[in-house]
Amino acid sequence: IVVFDARRIVESLRLETGLRPELAQRIAQDIEAIVRQSALRRVTSSLLRTLIDAKLIEYGLDAEYRAHSRLGLPITDIDRIIKQANQRTTPLPLTPEGTGLEIAAAIKREYALLAVFSAPVAEAHLVGDIFIQDLGAIDRPYAIVQSPDVVKRYGFTLPNRFAASRPARHPEVLVAHLVKSSAALQGYVNGAVEWDAVNFSLAPYLDGLGERELLQVAEALMFELSATAVGRGGNLPTCVIHLDWQVPPYLAERPAIGPGGNFTGRTYQDYRSVARRFLWALFAAYRDGDGQKLPFSGIRLVLHATPQDADPEWQTLVVKACRASLERGNVWFAFDHTPDRAFLSRFGLPYAASFAEAATDEWCAAAFQAVAINLPRAAHRAAPGKVVEVFEELTRLMDIAAQSHLEKRVFLEKLLARGEDGPLALLAARRGGRPFLKLSRTTHRVCPVGLNDLTQAVTGHQLHESSVARDFGARVIAHLAAEATRLSSRHKTHFVLAESHAEGMTERFAHMDARFFPRTAADGYPLDDAYPVENYVNGAKLSPAADLSPWQRAQWEGEVQQGSLLNATTDVWLGDALPTPEQLATLVDKVRFNGLTTGLMASPEFTACSVCGHVAVGSARACAACGAPQVETLAMLTNRYSRVSGWSTAAQSERHRRVRVTGHSL
């Protein structure tokens, strides 16, 4: 509450907007007249700013209005967030720390659209041409991936020497360092923190340990990584652990870093036996789950498979991994069809160009941003039957997505330039005389959304309905990949196609297209009443309602995607009648050899009882242990498990349309 003084309005306008003194004085006089006429007993700064903003708009001063805007939320929205009146999808409720983060993210979203992105980019986001993911995290990169060797070599260090530890000498200390590093990095990125080749990287610390000790290390790693959500106020971070049966080709002959950050005199290839034993222990710990037998929150295991994996021990491991997937979910099988693909799929950059000359303790890459493009929008903007116009529109969408990336990159570069005194101090820190994150090792993800819906609009068929549709879909992906290469060369940065996992994005695109482009069959666009467009199909996937065998789905998605999308997986939705681990392992092995599919994830559902705490695989209306009807279904939404009761209507409808896989269908 302030005492009204017109001179302060003049000072504020000149300071915040650079307005000419005479114009600022005129606006101040207008505001003073309004206040005098209103007979208000109290005049707050918020009210004054609102009145000034209205006058700036009245005078046609749009740039000055944007500069003068106050960012914030209505009281009802803040009340809803604090009291959590809305249902949340995540398994954990928000703590006061979490609600503070939610409110801050909402304000940052406004700031991003007003102050970071240009008007054309902001408009493209608002009208649904593109979707800039994680606007509430505008001041941080999207995701980061690194080798554990970074922590092994230099220990755990916080910026400005706030806290530091020497390189670990024992496996349990190394686990603590990895967990603390993950927790620290999750404050600097909004997406996943990924660790590469974890079982091989930790192997030099585990040499000589028995099976019980290996299991204890594995259990500590799993539990501690899943507990980092406590520090985020209930917001579940994602930690991705990459695992290998064969030592990755790019790591095989590299000198191994062992206890104390010292080289052991051996290569990682020499630790294959202990790395495999630790891999067994990790899946055993993961299968046990947490203390309530629930899936570990926020952890995703990625088991990489290569064409060389053929020995009986590998087959036994796959069965074990499939059993963990059936009982706990969140296990992703990644298929490294070539040595180049093995590195690219993890770091998003080619090994030879970016990392071949660097030591393993320098291996760190980040995705600065992820921007989704609305593929069906290209069909809506083009004239019916004009395929050339569709591809021209796709090029335009790629250009505007690239522009949004460049604008955020400039913003982040300014923050990084402030070094260890800036907000991105941990990423700007120097390790061993070298920067922790090099700008040359950053990528920008462009995420196609709705290829199936675009294909249906252009060809009259969904991807699974005809080879003509799949050929068209493959042409679209090839065009987008070529555009990403062109834009990378033009702007001297790395644009990559990737699969998006943003919640609510596909529904938003579908609703905005229905609002702005209400097409009918008379306009030349085929409609299908059995396929309501309330939620586009994500990425370059086939419809979840397509009645196909999982092998056929994986084959056709691989043909369309052509290995061009990072993090692309074929979803296998499981019903209540689960297949056996052996049946699922047979599917994994069959898909592995098609040379096309990049990933496979089998996702069961879970029923958690709110009364007795019992957790069972499958979706049920009552608890199998105590019979109570107070149960909650946990299911996969995009790439994480969440409470179905908190899903949107469109997401729940999509879940009901999913074709479930049973042992008979395999």
Segments from the language model and where they lie:
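Charged, amphipathic alpha-helical regulatory modules used
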Residues: 1-85, 653-660
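Catalytic-loop motifs flanking and including active-site residues across diverse enzymes
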Residues: 5, 9, 194, 447-451, ...
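Short, intrinsically disordered, low-complexity segments enriched in Ser/Thr and Pro
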Residues: 22, 481-488, 661-666
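Conserved catalytic cores of very large enzyme subunits
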Residues: 82-440, 461-462, 466-624, 628-633
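Contiguous, well-ordered alpha-helical segments that form the cores/surfaces of helical PPI scaffolds
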Residues: 200, 444-457, 478
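Core of folded catalytic or high-affinity ligand/protein-binding domains
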Residues: 436, 440, 446-447, 453, ...
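Long, charge-rich boundary regions
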Residues: 625-666
